[in-house]
């Protein structure tokens, strides 16, 4: 019995800083063979004091899901090309982090300062379909995408307008908003247009136009829905130059990765000046 256990090949995995192991399955494997290797590997990892065991299964190895679940694994998250399962094998409390809990969205207040008009759209589908509501261009920030670049991308995709990010004006948090489970973080941003001729994204946008800010604010929908009323008020104050938002300050993490801090626009300017002066003195 012991000799047979020694002959069973263990699954190869990459250890992490939290006494965990991630197994990335690549080669096709019979589910019974996989079960034997998994059992032997789990026994080995317990002896080593490992805690969280992750198994990454590509679409082509979906036949191994049932076997993994039978050995105590549970779903953690899925992407288009793989499923991630996890099992906590330690006697200590389970500290496996939850799956991603938030989706980040952004709305764009694009201001034409010459005419005091803002860019608005009517959508072909979704919540606002057939409601005759003119709304700001909005969209979801992609994985690995910064808020300030994502909101500009959405504006160009929906309207053809090229615009530069200026500030984050406000943000709101809404629970159970995505798939009745995930939390939606929505950032209201102001952008400055570099072009003014509109080309609607026919697949999503019914029509788009430049609208006087007061007309946007006075829409019945904005009047009767408090959250939209507050957002519209912030937009109006920004158009009247009576509101200061959060600008970006480029920086780097301790590992050298590029990152951005969002802070009061006035203070952001001071931080940039201070950094430039320090760089000039080197």
Curated annotation (Swiss-Prot):
Expression tissues: Expressed in stems, leaves, roots, flowers and siliques.
The Nudix hydrolase domain, residue ranges: 101-233
A cellular-component GO term for this protein: plasma membrane
Keyword Repeat in annotation: no
Induction description: Rapid and transient induction by biotic and abiotic stresses. Not induced by H(2)O(2).
Signal peptide: none
Gene Ontology MF, one: ADP-ribose diphosphatase activity
EC number: 3.6.1.-, 3.6.1.13, 3.6.1.22
Nudix box, short sequence motif: residues: 139-160
InterPro entries from the UniProt entry: NUDIX_hydrolase-like_dom_sf (IPR015797), Nudix_hydrolase6-like (IPR003293), NUDIX_hydrolase_CS (IPR020084), NUDIX_hydrolase_dom (IPR000086), Pre-Nudix (IPR040618)
Summary of the knockout phenotype: Growth retardation, constitutive pathogen resistance phenotype and increased levels of reactive oxygen species and NADH.
PANTHER family: NUDIX HYDROLASE 7, NUDIX HYDROLASE RELATED
Family: Belongs to the Nudix hydrolase family.
Quaternary structure and partners: Homodimer. Interacts with RACK1A, GG1 and GG2.
Protein name as it appears in the record: Nudix hydrolase 7
Taxonomic classification: Eukaryota, Viridiplantae, Streptophyta, Embryophyta, Tracheophyta
